[in-house]
Amino acid sequence: MKVHHSIVAAACFLVATVAGVTAPRITTVSIAGEGFLINGKPTYAGRAWKGQSVEGLLFNSRMVQGIFDDLNTNTVSKWAYPDTGQWDAERNTREFIAAMPEWRRHGMLAFTINLQGGSPQGYSREQPWHNSAIAPDGSLRPDYMQRLQRIMDRADELGMVVILGYFYFGQDERLRDEAAVIRATDLATQWIFDRGYRNVLVEINNECNVRYDHAILKPERVHELIERVRKVSRDGRRLLVSTSYGGGTIPKENVVRASDFLLLHGNGVSDPKKIAQMVRQTRSVAGYRPVPILFNEDDHFDFDKPENNFVAAVSERASWGYFDFRMKDEGFGEGYQSVPVNWGISSDRKRGFFRLLREITDVRP
């Protein structure tokens, strides 16, 4: 079936190229109650693991650097590949795309990517590098968006969902004012519709409660952008949208009421019991109604232990997402956020995640 989908996608792309129109898309994500569906069918349909249903969950990984580049000539040399001594944005995207089928074969149905990336060091106090698909006036940079389109086209072919973040707190200062933020939101939303993507979940910004410059990206007002995206429709279809908070933070009522699904982060939460508690607390926020709860960032591992954050999320019927970066003195094979990235399943931590993911989902590579 995967081969068939690839052939169909390639044929449709050729027809669309000749005709000058957007290719028909293969993958559609939707929501029913607390579960996700792909092409009208619950994810991991009928699957249970250790007595716990995983049907409708959306296991994922934080892969935010898929279109990374650095426009700051003073810092770009930091990201040189060890084999060439140079940074190469095209190579980064090309290797990302090449790795995607293997992620999918292990049962991973979604990944997060961001128009402004994330810290290329994993965590950073200062972020002088300039990595943004969004120009100061809110327009979209064509080179970044062309790289993103290649990734999203491949995700569509593979039956994968893209959690697309618009803004990141380490780069939002690159936009000159609130009008630029609103323009970027509108243009990114239009870009998705113009290309016919139906496999997208929008994350307005990564961790809205962390040092953003623009007030509309902060917790008190971010729901305005969520609602703005939700109001846009084309051919009777609109995008599914939410935003996230820093590790351990429970979404606020304004975001809970406005969102189609709820994003949690497990960074800083080392006790799996507290991960389960976060899910229960989220369901208790005023305005909550049955929608999916999804962790899309958690830098805790212990995948070989009976209790870990991944397992704890599953126990509360919440989706979970892996966040890994290259730690001090580690080699090129480690992490999916530190630049340059080895996008393969190239380390013990990565293998541990994908091994447990494959066990939980019963997907065979």
How would you label these PLM feature ranges?
Residues 1, 156, 196, 344, ...:
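Short, flexible coil/linker elements and helix-boundary hinge sites characteristic
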Residues 9-17:
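Bacterial N-terminal signal peptides
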Residues 27, 34-38, 42-90, 284, ...:
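Extended substrate-binding grooves/exosites of carbohydrate-active enzymes
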Residues 32, 37, 42-43, 48-259, ...:
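Active-site mouth of glycoside hydrolases
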Residues 183-184, 199-201, 205-352:
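Extracellular glycoside hydrolase catalytic/binding regions
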